[in-house]
Structures are given as structure tokens and as C-alpha cells.
């Protein structure tokens, strides 16, 4: 199971999931679609999410389509459902999208 020690302060904020109001729920996963100005910005975002995912050892499904839309989906594959790790990861992805450094 991933350990999010570096991001522990975010866990406390996840008691109230309203921080994730831009995320939907589908097929036992949470997802969000992000829109960018162009392909390069979308790809840069994907690379940032990929780096974070490696760091926390929790990996999303990522879909880039129509050259500027990115769909990020999380579910804990070993449990086949959404867990706190997924909510935590989604919150961190939102921070990346908002331009905050982690």
C-alpha cells in the first residue's frame, strides 16, 4: 500500500471530500477531465502527474484526447474500488493543475 508521508497534511483535509467536487465517479473509480490551451500543456501536465505517481507509488489511468483534454482516473486496482489513496492522489493532481508546487 502506498505511503503518503510527505503529503500527510493533505490527508486531514480529505475528511470532507468537497475539495474534490470537480471529480466524478464511474466504474468504481473517480475521474476528472482537464482542459488545456494546447497539446504541449496537456502533455506537460501528464508528465507532472506521472512523476508524482511514481513518487507516491499510486498510478492513475490517463487518457489524452482531442489534443488538449486529459482524463485522469483513479481506483485501487488491488481492491477494485476507490480508497483513501485515490482521494489523496486526486487531491494532489488538483494541486498540480492549479500550479501549486508539491
Where are these predicted regions, by residue range?
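Charge-rich alpha-helical segments
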Residues: 1-102
Amino acid at each position: 500500500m502506498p505511503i503518503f508521508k510527505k503529503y500527510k497534511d493533505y490527508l486531514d483535509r480529505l475528511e470532507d471530500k468537497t475539495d474534490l467536487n470537480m471529480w466524478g465517479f464511474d466504474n468504481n473509480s473517480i475521474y476528472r477531465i482537464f482542459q488545456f490551451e494546447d497539446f504541449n500543456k496537456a502533455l506537460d501536465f501528464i508528465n507532472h502527474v506521472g512523476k508524482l505517481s511514481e513518487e507516491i507509488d499510486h498510478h492513475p489511468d490517463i487518457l489524452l484526447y482531442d489534443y488538449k483534454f486529459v482524463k485522469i482516473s483513479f481506483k485501487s486496482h488491488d481492491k477494485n474500488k476507490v480508497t483513501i489513496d485515490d482521494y489523496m492522489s486526486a487531491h494532489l493532481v488538483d494541486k498540480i493543475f492549479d500550479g501549486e508546487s508539491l
